[in-house]
């Protein structure tokens, strides 16, 4: 998954994420190719090419990570949607405005949430283009819940090529307390604005560079509960992926969408 070195973004228009010993924008490690309709809310955020993921909230609004848009100019960005491929198919739409959370901290990667408003509306209710529902404000995941992470990130740590087709993986939620204890050894903090997921004992399943900003969806409720944010390496044993806790930002999201 992404790696937070407590430094910040690395090559914003290549992969954009926070880093530790690797880099933040993750892709899916240990997953499978997504099939039509598996993740219809997934979009590719692009400059000259794919660099982050995002999630469809409605015809105009995309949810992504703050670190993905940090320092970015809206006029240079577009999204591709309604396709399983980040480089072809579907439709591209230009970005009109970027709303980065006011309290985003690029050192701790806290409040890692942003909204993107599009210039023209998407055509939704297609097999690969549907909005994802938000959870209730203040809601949280439970240990052991199954969550689905998707994206076009690297398939393994140290890889430098993105898969052409969308990947997905279902993982288990890890307790915030355990996650914080594990990351404290690397000098990082897991806040109440974050959730964690993966296989702590064995590793092998995670997001990786290129997945940043993408959706983390509760398999049971189909609601978006997380945003791919950061991590230590990709799918490393003892280091679960860390995701923005969407439940803590629903009021913020709705306030921006109503402006």
From Swiss-Prot:
Gene Ontology terms, cellular component aspect? extracellular region
Q: Indicate the residues removed as propeptide on maturation.
A: 17-27
SUPFAM superfamilies documented for this protein: Trypsin-like serine proteases
Identify the residue position(s) of the site Required for specificity: 206
User: Subcellular localization, per the record?
Assistant: Secreted
Specify the superkingdom: Eukaryota
For this protein, the record's Pfam families field holds: Trypsin (PF00089)
PROSITE patterns, per the entry: TRYPSIN_DOM, TRYPSIN_HIS, TRYPSIN_SER
Q: Which EC class does it fall in? A: hydrolase
User: EC number(s)?
Assistant: 3.4.21.-
Active site located where? 67, 112, 212
Q: What is its main location?
A: secreted
UniProt-listed InterPro entries: Peptidase_S1 (IPR050430), Peptidase_S1_PA (IPR009003), Peptidase_S1_PA_chymotrypsin (IPR043504), Peptidase_S1A (IPR001314), Trypsin_dom (IPR001254), TRYPSIN_HIS (IPR018114), TRYPSIN_SER (IPR033116)
Q: Where is the signal peptide?
A: 1-16
Tell me which UniProt keywords the record has, alphabetically: Allergen, Disulfide bond, Hydrolase, Protease, Secreted, Serine protease, Signal, Zymogen
Q: Which GO terms describe its molecular function?
A: serine-type endopeptidase activity
Every copy of the Peptidase S1 domain together lies at 28-258
Disulfide bonds listed in the record:
52-68, 179-196, 208-234
Q: Which PANTHER family match?
A: FI18310P1-RELATED, POLYSERASE-RELATED
Q: Which family does it belong to?
A: Belongs to the peptidase S1 family.
Protein's name according to its UniProt entry: Mite allergen Der f 3
């Amino acid at each position: 998954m992404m790696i937070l070195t407590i430094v910040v973004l690395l090559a914003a228009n290549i992969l954009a994420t926070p880093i530790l010993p690797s880099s933040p924008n993750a892709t899916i490690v240990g997953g499978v190719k997504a099939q039509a309709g598996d993740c219809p809310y997934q979009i590719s955020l692009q400059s000259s090419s794919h660099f982050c993921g995002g999630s469809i909230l409605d015809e105009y609004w995309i949810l992504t990570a703050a670190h993905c848009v940090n320092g970015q100019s809206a006029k240079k960005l577009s999204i591709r949607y309604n396709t399983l491929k980040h480089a072809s198919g579907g439709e591209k739409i230009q970005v009109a405005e970027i709303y980065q959370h006011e309290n985003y901290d690029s050192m701790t990667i806290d409040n890692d949430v942003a909204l993107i408003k599009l210039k023209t509306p998407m055509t939704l209710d297609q097999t690969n283009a549907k909005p994802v529902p938000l959870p209730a404000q203040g809601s949280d995941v439970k240990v052991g819940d199954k969550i689905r992470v998707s994206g076009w990130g690297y398939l393994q740590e140290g890889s430098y090529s993105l898969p052409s087709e969308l990947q997905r993986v279902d993982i288990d939620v890890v307790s915030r307390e355990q996650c914080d204890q594990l990351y404290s050894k690397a000098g990082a903090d897991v806040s109440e604005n974050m959730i964690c997921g993966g296989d702590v004992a064995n590793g092998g399943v995670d997001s990786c560079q290129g997945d940043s900003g993408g959706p983390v969806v509760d398999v049971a409720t189909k609601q978006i509960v997380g945003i791919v944010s950061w991590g230590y390496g990709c799918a490393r044993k003892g280091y679960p992926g860390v995701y923005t806790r969407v439940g803590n930002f629903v009021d913020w999201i709705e306030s921006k969408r109503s402006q």
